[in-house]
From Swiss-Prot:
In the N-terminal section; belongs to the ubiquitin family. In the C-terminal section; belongs to the eukaryotic ribosomal protein eS30 family. The lineage of its organism: Eukaryota, Metazoa, Chordata, Craniata, Vertebrata. It comes from the Eukaryota. FAU encodes a fusion protein consisting of the ubiquitin-like protein FUBI at the N terminus and ribosomal protein S30 at the C terminus. GO terms for cellular component: cytosolic small ribosomal subunit; nucleus. Residues 1-74 form the Ubiquitin-like domain. It comes from Oryctolagus cuniculus (Rabbit). GO terms for molecular function: structural constituent of ribosome. FUBI is cleaved from ribosomal protein S30 by the deubiquitinase USP36 before the assembly of ribosomal protein S30 into pre-40S ribosomal particles. FUBI removal from ribosomal protein S30 is a crucial event for the final maturation of pre-40S particles. This is Ubiquitin-like FUBI-ribosomal protein eS30 fusion protein. One of its GO terms (biological process) is translation.
Amino acid sequence: MQLFVRAQELHTLEVTGRETVAQIKAHVASLEGIAPEDQVVLLAGTPLEDEATLGQCGVEALSTLEVAGRMLGGKVHGSLARVGKVRGQTLKVAKQEKKKKRTGRAKRRMQYNRRFVNVVPTFGKKKGPNANS
């Protein structure tokens, strides 16, 4: 069966289906010059194990395998290392039931009582509702 291998260039390989992924990596290494240990072979975005055969991995005729090079690194510096830290450390608190707010006539009645009925008369200049003293 034919198999397409997309590395730096697109290659067509003739395989039987009993080859291992390691053999495909060795073949790509001879074509592209990338060391087999530096290659990652992907089928539909999922990496394939070296010892698995193409048949076990579900590779069919005219499938495309992608070969990507391994990236150096591993440490994350700066603010990316702390992404999500605060949210992960914050404790989850259960929502509390709130009393239903009054609307319409009941709300107007409450406002009237607050403004005119329950007012304690004081001497001096009148102060607004947002005054700090």
